[in-house]
Amino acid sequence: MDQLRQSLLEAPIIEKGDYEYFVHPVSDGVPVLRPELLREIVIKIIRKVEVDNVDKIVTPAAMGIHISTAVSLMTDIPLVVIRKRQYGLEGEVSLSQQTGYAENEMYINDVRDGERVLVLDDVLSTGGTMRAVLDALDQIGAEVVDTVAVIKKAGPNELDESDHDVKTLINVRVTDGTVVIVDSNGDG
């Protein structure tokens, strides 16, 4: 993952309260997301998961959408986006998302009991978003075949004590305003 690794090493760091936050095209849409970086990420995801056993890809809005769309296009697996807007459609399930810097209500539609899903997201940091998504999918009765976050920010997160294993492409930590690569192969 040379391009992903290099782009993370070059990522600017900002502070949101006590939280050191790296600004990256995968997680923030800035700086510009180069097609070769997106292609590298998508190929790595497809190699890391068993897409043959997946009925739908599920991703939370907003920054997982571009990655999940590209994976959907390459695999012909339909995509479900978990949104921050409620529509009140039949079967809509609400979930509360809490991250290191925000709290939101989100909504999922079009996932049914027994469907096999691949959950994709951009970053696993506190685990708040992923935990809420996985809990909602459990509530629906979906079978989570695999869960992937492109980047994992090393440290404790809400999924450490859960039954869900999250595969990642690269693991980093932010130390003194700099991104440090902890594991260039990620988890799983």
Swiss-Prot record:
Keywords: Purine salvage, Transferase. It holds the Pfam family Pribosyltran. Transmembrane segments: none annotated. It comes from the Archaea. It is an enzyme of class 2 (transferase). GO terms for biological process: purine ribonucleoside salvage. GO terms for molecular function: transferase activity. Disulfide bonds: none annotated. The keyword Cytoplasm does not apply. The keyword Transferase applies. InterPro entries: HGPRTase-like, PRibTrfase_dom, PRTase-like, Pur/Pyrimidine_PRTase. Its EC number is 2.4.2.-. HAMAP family: Hypx_phosphoribosyltr. May catalyze a purine salvage reaction, the substrate is unknown. Belongs to the purine/pyrimidine phosphoribosyltransferase family. Archaeal HPRT subfamily. This is HGPRTase-like protein 1. It comes from Haloquadratum walsbyi (strain DSM 16790 / HBSQ001).
